Amino acid sequence: MVDVKTCLDNAQEKMDMAVMYLEEALAHIRAGKASTRLLDGIRVDSYGSMVPISNVAALSTPDARSITIKPWDKSMFRAIEKAIIDSDLGIMPENNGEVIRIGIPPLTEERRRQLAKQCKAEGETAKVSVRNARRDGIDALKKAVKDGLAEDEQKNAEAKLQKIHDKYIKQIEDMLADKDKEIMTV
């Protein structure tokens, strides 16, 4: 027989994962300020394997408009530059032989709108995942009723599941509002 607590815990775990995915996705959407997290998703070919830039170089932000990358191995300059150019970030690296500098240009109004739209799409994906977790939980509870769980226990558990769902949806909406504000602030 399925335990009510297990159903709720499983659903909450799936909802947690959806929120964590959204946090990660929003961190990669630049808001006009330099951040080394902007480069987290970029992989570099290092001796035949694809690794994050942070595994082959030191990353820093000397000011609000630039990122510096200092490769530990001088032979990695080309691979790092190529990976950055091939990414969809729309930034160009400058190599001076010692470090790679990336100037973060101020966002245009049109680009800000595109990024806000991208954030909303990521948020909608997270909301769908949270709703799917709720649906899976409800299905598990209905199956538990067939296995002998009392119907009033099922209804109480569904109400708890709905409250958990609402909390996560609100958290997602708050995250999106914060990111939207960050993007749209000039």
Curated annotation (Swiss-Prot):
Official protein name in the record: Ribosome-recycling factor
Function: Responsible for the release of ribosomes from messenger RNA at the termination of protein biosynthesis. May increase the efficiency of translation by recycling ribosomes from one round of translation to another.
Keywords: Cytoplasm, Protein biosynthesis
NCBIfam families reported for this sequence: frr
Family matches, as Pfam families: RRF
BP-aspect Gene Ontology terms: translation; translational termination
Family membership: Belongs to the RRF family.
GO molecular function (one): ribosomal large subunit binding
CDD domains for this protein: RRF
Cellular component, GO annotation: cytoplasm
